[in-house]
Regions:
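Long, C-terminal-biased catalytic regions of enzyme "large/alpha" subunits
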Residues: 1-206
Length: 206
């Protein structure tokens, strides 16, 4: 209802100048919210914490925890389909990379539910479906596991593989890329590269 009252003036480059539409000034965007023209994202975070609290397991355990995590994800997708059928608006589950909001959400959960070991006892919650950073896991196993959750995040998702300096092992970079291609998943793999550049004045800087 709030969006239906918005006009093209809120973002002229999007709604007036062709990025998304060519509406007139002050024209309502209401009609463009319906019938497949645009999508409303249902973002989520903290799947690990949810599963840990409900089952006592991580969603990475390939057992009870993972099964429950996939059920939660399927339920989110089912609700999106239900809302779409009722409202003629596309909804889609989005594996949210919420960045700094992980700290805000953790603080809110702690204030609401208190300190729960393994759930609210950290200063952050885990992004979307990601394997929590404190769990040790092989890079390829991580991709394989997270691929199943990416399938249930059709509105957008990304998996991260943090790597050391791989400049001496380009084959490892190649294998990561081919694995991501094989699973048809969105992957980011930031890694350290130590370089020395020179400015136009000839003085080096790191």
């Amino acid at each position: 209802k709030r969006l239906s009252k918005a006009t093209s003036d809120v973002a002229p480059i999007l709604w007036q100048h062709g990025a998304l539409a060519r509406l007139g000034k002050g024209e309502s965007i209401h009609d463009l919210l319906h019938n497949g023209y645009s999508t409303i994202s249902l973002g989520y975070a903290g799947l690990y914490e949810c599963v840990k609290y409900m089952t006592g397991h991580s969603h990475t355990d390939n057992g009870k925890g993972k099964e429950f995590g996939l059920q939660v994800m399927q339920h989110l997708n089912d609700k999106c389909k239900e809302w779409k059928a009722a409202e003629a608006i596309d909804y889609s589950v989005y594996g949210t990379p919420i960045e700094a909001t992980t700290y805000k959400f953790a603080k809110c959960l702690k204030e609401r539910f208190g300190v729960i070991k393994g759930v609210t006892d950290r200063d952050y919650i885990t992004n979307s479906y990601h394997v929590p950073v404190f769990e040790e896991i092989d890079a390829f196993e991580k991709l394989k596991l997270e691929a199943e959750f990416q399938n249930l995040s059709p509105g957008g998702a990304i998996s991260y593989i943090e790597s050391p300096n791989l400049s001496n092992s380009p084959i490892k970079i190649y294998l990561l890329i081919t694995e991501a291609q094989a699973t048809d998943k969105h992957l980011s793999s930031p890694f350290v590269i130590n370089v020395i550049l020179r400015t136009t004045f000839g003085s080096p800087f790191k």
